[in-house]
């Protein structure tokens, strides 16, 4: 794949280029230090991915991303910045990933792998594949693989695979993950729109679970189920969601 690094700091560009050169999926790397140079390169070249800083000297990387998205063959955008406060806006622009400085090899490789997987899915979209795969690849929310949440004026980037469940009680949404739990004032509906339906199942009007974290399913009162998830989190499937739950897990 061909990558473009956009950053007005030479040291940051050099560091990122070094790490990308260690990745076998990257065949060619070019650099740009400002908006004008970036747009010129995008006009005459085709890139698979662009690593984009947010604080550029002549313009915001967010504004540049908006311009890139309007291009006919726009590359996958990966924001590479020292500022986490723009994460929500970045994902609203359908960014593939959001990486914080200082860069780490593993994190860079993860971002490159996301682009590689997205390209493979795009190539296979016209092939005959299973309904489960179609559901996941057609769901644009699954392309980023992360959920940005804001807690106490700080934005946390959660990988979908780390999220165990989301539940609401008294207007507070609790997000349980494999590492810790978070509480936010955003509605469950707000997060439901950002989560891929291929991975997350709504089992109650106030609860969404990650089906990959379901450990056991027990018969419960009134012909319902009780679920035990990772870290022994327990949730009940309400009767009104039983049919959908069984269908999504292939229990019928």
From Swiss-Prot:
Residues 147-251 form the HTH LytTR-type domain. Pfam families: LytTR, Response_reg. Phosphorylated by LytS. Gene3D superfamilies: 2.20.25.10, 2.40.50.40, 3.40.50.2300. Residues 2-116 form the Response regulatory domain. Keywords: Cytoplasm, DNA-binding, Phosphoprotein, Transcription, Transcription regulation, Two-component regulatory system. One of its GO terms (molecular function) is DNA binding. It is found in: Cytoplasm. The modification 4-aspartylphosphate is found at residue 53. One of its GO terms (cellular component) is cytoplasm. PANTHER family: STAGE 0 SPORULATION PROTEIN A HOMOLOG (PTHR37299:SF1), TRANSCRIPTIONAL REGULATOR-RELATED (PTHR37299). Member of the two-component regulatory system LytR/LytS that probably regulates genes involved in cell wall metabolism. This is Sensory transduction protein LytR. It comes from Staphylococcus epidermidis (strain ATCC 12228 / FDA PCI 1200). The gene is lytR.
